[in-house]
Amino acid sequence: MRDAFTRALMREAEKDPRLTLVTGDLGFGVLKPFWETYPEQFVNAGIAEQAMTGLAAGLAMTGRTVLTYSIGNFPTLRCIEQIRNDCAYHDANVKVVCVGGGFVYGSLGMSHHATEDMAILRALPGVTVFTPGDPHEVEAIVPVMLRTPGTCYLRLGRGGEPCLHPGPIENYDAPRALTLREGTDVALLSAGGILTQTVAAADLLAQKGVSAEVVSFPCIKPIDREKLAELATRFRHIVTVEEHSIVGGFGGAVCETLAEMGAGCRIHRIGMEDVYSCIVGTQQYLREKYDMDAAAICERTLAWLAE
């Protein structure tokens, strides 16, 4: 996802000299093509994320479109007050970019486990939250995000994620959800890089004779209400999957929306329970430990369908 982000950003920077990227002293292996090509549109704010965010807000007030870039919780939780007071409150044209949503940096411990970010950023008035599931979605979302007024949050994986869509996504318009696979028995809704596990779970369910529809939500605030309403009329069971706490995140957004609609379907949320991730390990290891890998998604879905 990181490489897809850089490619898309460079295409936009060529068209708009006001586009500015501010990094918190990292990401140089990925961002090097950007700063070498557009040195006047690149700032290294150092390991000072609060200052980075305040700087971005100030630059945005001069008419620039500014992106802040860091890993894990550092561009979000570490500077949430600056995002709230300096950026979102003023509708500043700042796009907060997190590389490493969920357990991407799992081996570095809970300080680097980004499992509350979507809920916190979703709660800020006026902030748009983007959660692409594969590199194709990233490249489709970046130009849309840059055209979206005000403060936005872009939650990325790290790198090496497979392309799950058959090809580039043309003419994406937020918050449109994207169907990867049609099904008849259950709907699996996914937000973010956990999409790889959701698609794999659908394959496992197919082996059990269960037809699962897979829908990716590259934008969760605002959320695609029309798609949710349509799914609620077709499926008795809807399963949400996120590498994030089930409290206030994607699953919460789906529940809130369908409850307001008076939908009669059952909603089941897969993600972190209301606990901290106290285990250290690789991303896949932690997905397995917290029952959000493909096998767990399959097993839990089968159990719900049997109820």
Where are these regions (language model features)?
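Thiamine diphosphate
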Residues: M1-R155, G157-E307
